[in-house]
Amino acid sequence: MPFDLRDHTADVAVEATGSTLADLFAAVADGLAAASCEAIPADGGHTDFAVAVDAEGLEALLFDYLDQLIYERDVRDVLPVDHRVRLSPPDQTVESESDTAADTEEDWHLSGTYRGVPLASIDAREVKAVTYSEMRVEETATGWSAYVVFDV
């Protein structure tokens, strides 16, 4: 999944693309892992973990997903890598009692898995937080793109 790390004053930014929204979210998460550790060990001696988040919009969902991964790192003492993501969009309309369609405020849902690499086995720098600064999620002619800034 393609992503590039971008220099950002006192922070690090990830610019990612994906042919689908799920691919995009996984690519940004892989970029977060790359921002944390230059050499991620190959598959071996790891544990798989599940993650799930809900949010009202795509940027909020991406923020909450990345924030959850940082939390998982801190609580489980692992670096989340090799992300697999599934997204479910909110229902767009419901029938009301007057038989007219009305927009709903239901949330997007993300469920996924990642491989947890023990932090004790790698030389990782701490990514403190995801930010909304300059964050964007956009549909493009070839799929989706995102830009996310992390506080380091």
Task: Annotate each PLM feature.
Residues 2-152:
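Intrinsically disordered, low-complexity regions
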